[in-house]
Amino acid sequence: MAKIYTDKDASLEPLKGKTIAVIGYGIQGRAQALNLRDSGLKVIIGLRKGGNSWNLAVSEGFEVYEVSDAVAQADVIMVLIPDMEQPKVWQNQIAPFLKEGAVVDFAHGFNIHYGLIKPPKNVDVIMVAPKAPGKAVREEFLAGRGVPALVAVHQDYSGAALKYALAIAKGIGATRAGVIETTFAEETETDLIGEQIVLVGGLMELIKKGFEVLVEMGYQPEVAYFEVLNEAKLIMDLIWQRGIYGMLNGVSDTAKYGGLTVGPKIIDEEVKKKMRIFALRVKSGEFAKEWVEEYARGGLTLKKLMESARTHPIEIVGAEMRKLLFGRQQE
């Protein structure tokens, strides 16, 4: 069974009197920085000078420094910039300025797990990974709640790395909801596998193929959109709130029977075998290698795929349907 920590298992004491540098002030960086400050901790921000994020952080009362200057004065460094930007920033603006005994925190294990960032031996390397977007991290904190998170230790130079990870988790409100101990490998691999075979890749293609089948059979695209995409939220909300069995108890008997008899014939053992093939690509590092090479080429393949997604018929119909539902196009 997984080890789960709550508020009673964590303390802010390891962070008291220390300077925390949050590198990045995007959706996660801003939320975590604000929560940590509201928890009574000293937080500074490290950014490229002059950008919109710099001005926003200053306007919200933070001391803001260029990344290297923030790292040089920090005891705890939270690397909250996008994964693919991290290796270059690490090499040029973080690693040369780290203090011995510093604590380096990541919100995702990708660069550490796949060896794109190699920290020196004289620092702690930890991960605190909220399992929600930054907006929810902040909103739940302000409401007196929190979002769940994962914590992991990659390198324990101080002997207290887990305590630092739990302190950060407590400071951002995650221990209010529950924090699961994991490893960098497990977090990275399950995150990527889940995105590819279910949450982004699998779900997206399932919806698109269902839409295509209905339209090819002569049904109106607008009706098809509602049936396979719009109503997906209703089902996912039930699953999120009640679990899969609870969702089944929340739909009609006709939906139950149809879903339970037809679903396994579509998502069958052959699909499961394909899922495993692509999961193993993640585990072996093959996907990471492919993605790093793609990013180095300027993301040309990704741009083409995004354009194809943008122009799919479900998006053309969806733009009009979202205006009807929400009064404007939702990005």
Curated annotation (Swiss-Prot):
Q: Where do the catalytic residues lie?
A: H108
Residue span(s) of domain KARI C-terminal knotted: 183-328
Q: Which cofactor does it need?
A: Mg(2+)
Q: How is the cofactor bound?
A: Binds 2 magnesium ions per subunit.
Q: What is its EC number?
A: 1.1.1.86
Q: Which molecular-function annotation in GO is an example for this chain?
A: ketol-acid reductoisomerase activity
Protein role = Involved in the biosynthesis of branched-chain amino acids (BCAA). Catalyzes an alkyl-migration followed by a ketol-acid reduction of (S)-2-acetolactate (S2AL) to yield (R)-2,3-dihydroxy-isovalerate. In the isomerase reaction, S2AL is rearranged via a Mg-dependent methyl migration to produce 3-hydroxy-3-methyl-2-ketobutyrate (HMKB). In the reductase reaction, this 2-ketoacid undergoes a metal-dependent reduction by NADPH to yield (R)-2,3-dihydroxy-isovalerate.
Among PANTHER family, the record links this protein to: KETOL-ACID REDUCTOISOMERASE, MITOCHONDRIAL
Name of the molecule in the record: Ketol-acid reductoisomerase (NADP(+))
